[in-house]
Swiss-Prot record:
The family this protein is said to belong to: Belongs to the Maf family. YhdE subfamily.
Protein name, entry field: dTTP/UTP pyrophosphatase
HAMAP family: Maf (MF_00528)
Biological source species: Caulobacter vibrioides (strain ATCC 19089 / CIP 103742 / CB 15) (Caulobacter crescentus)
Catalytic activity: dTTP + H2O = dTMP + diphosphate + H(+); UTP + H2O = UMP + diphosphate + H(+)
Keyword tRNA processing: no
Important for substrate specificity, annotated site positions: R15, T74, Q157
Superkingdom in the source lineage: Bacteria
Entry keyword set: Cytoplasm, Hydrolase, Nucleotide metabolism
Length: 193
């Protein structure tokens, strides 16, 4: 019997792979998309997250015709301001300054392209409250390095989890992949593990 279409995860994020494993989904392979993630002029955080997820899926689908391709992008926003993925100490200090003592949104766009080329997307928005950080908390977090490569400079599953005062929405989405919506996308487009 011939094997069905493969599931390709268009992400290098170990967190997304772990989240999928929690619900019994194991991608056949991982093929990260390398795209320009710079926000477009006047692009809202919602549109940005969805656009990047779909763009990542399309780039990888072109390399994997006949397979399912799953992609996601997580954006942290304070109002309409999209925070960067922190790569430097300057990035994380900027993010922490904006997040400290405020509510913000974590938006995760998910895109799935089916073997026949059909595409579907979902966007999950979660409201997150951040405590006001003391200088010692901020400096300790920066020294930890846990912020590297994270949208908005933090991961809720690490030290920064202690800064969260409130979370309204999807915890897995804040980690990097909304599981309920992702499973619905997969089944809706005919993926069967």
């Amino acid at each position: 019997m011939a094997a069905g279409p493969a599931l390709v995860l268009a992400s290098a994020s170990p967190r997304r792979l772990d989240l999928l494993a929690q619900v019994g989904v194991t991608p056949d392979r991982v093929d990260p998309a390398d795209i320009d993630e710079t926000p477009l002029r006047d692009e809202t955080p919602r549109r940005h997250a969805l656009r990047l997820a779909l763009e990542k899926a399309r780039v990888v689908a072109a390399r994997a015709p006949g397979d399912f391709v799953l992609a996601a992008d997580t954006v942290v926003a304070v109002g309409r301001r999209i925070l960067p993925k922190a790569e430097t100490e300057a990035d994380v200090l900027y993010c922490l300054k904006l997040l400290s003592g405020r509510n913000h949104k974590v938006l995760t766009g998910v895109a799935l392209i089916a073997p026949d080329g059909r595409a579907a997307t979902r966007l999950v928005e979660t409201k997150v409250g951040f405590k006001r950080l003391s200088d010692a908390e901020r400096d300790g977090y920066v020294a930890s390095g846990q912020w590297r490569g994270k949208a908005g400079g933090y991961g809720v599953q690490g030290l920064a989890g202690g800064f969260i005062t409130d979370l309204q929405g999807s915890y897995p989405s804040v980690v990097g992949l909304p599981l309920y919506e992702t499973l619905n996308l997969l089944s809706g487009l005919g993926y069967r593990p």
